[in-house]
Amino acid sequence: YSTTGSTDSRFAQMAREHCCKFEEIFKRYPNKTFLFEITDESDPHIVEEELGETFIGLIDAKTGAQESEFELDKIAASTAGALKRPFYKDGEQYLKTSFSELKNIVKEAKFEGFMVYIPSQNDFCFKMKTPYYLVNKFFARSKNEALSGKLDKTKLDEEFHPLIDHIKANEREFRSLDEQGKLGFIKEFLEKV
């Protein structure tokens, strides 16, 4: 078990704790590396996610080739629900839409984002993060010494200017918060707007 190359970090230990239950499945796919998004209470995400493991990839250890989303779905289906796959909403796994429509959906979404694929090739193209996620990450993970520069309105789209004004008006309080406190502060404000 590893995370970004480390086999002994606390995140690698977390992966081991979450994924050891899948070892029988792993044995069916020798020389393959399983990729998971793990959401754990001890490592809160920028936006709320369901706790647990989500199967997001499978890589051939010899060639580096990645399995298609279609193949990942087949593998997950063969595990009687043990491997959970990502979904868009209401259990719907894929959103088939145009790029221009996706840009509109992303503007309103309150989750991390989308993995975008080329349908004709079933091939991963890029990640599209939501502004909601990006602005939360931008401010919540900011060190106090970097906050002043981040409160420059030229660095964010104008729809986030009221948030900048709110943070500036409450800057002392905001600076005193830890990451989770900052996320709560931002979320509370964005829900009111």
Language-model features, listed with the residues they occupy:
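Core nucleotide-handling region used for phosphoryl-transfer chemistry
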Residues: 1-193
